[in-house]
A protein has these predicted regions:
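Acidic, low-complexity, intrinsically disordered interaction modules
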Residues: 24-71
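Mixed-charge, Lys/Arg-enriched low-complexity segments
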Residues: 2-20, 60-88
Length: 88
């Protein structure tokens, strides 16, 4: 990963398209790496990674691959099955 590949201007659009505003408030935008926005949950400290069209991504080594949003949201937010997740 090179310094030029890291974006430092926040982009909330992908997260706002997936979650209600009160749930977006649970995250901090951290950085963009190769088109993937990295949002850190304020309680769990886990990352939710979304690309520009809202696909949820996971990191494996230096690569990203797509994963189901609902599953990742539950893990990142610490919510369990059956809890209200208010996905937009």
């Amino acid at each position: 990963m090179t310094a030029s590949a890291i974006g430092t201007t926040s982009n909330w659009t992908p997260l706002e398209a997936k979650l209600a505003p009160e749930l977006c408030a649970e995250f901090m935008w951290m950085y963009r790496d190769r088109g993937v926005e990295h949002y850190k949950h304020i309680q769990t400290r886990r990352y939710l990674r979304l690309d520009s069209v809202g696909r949820c991504m996971a990191r494996q080594g230096d690569s990203f691959y797509e994963i189901p949003f609902d599953d990742e949201w539950k893990w990142v937010s610490g919510r369990s099955e059956g809890e209200e997740n208010a996905i937009a």
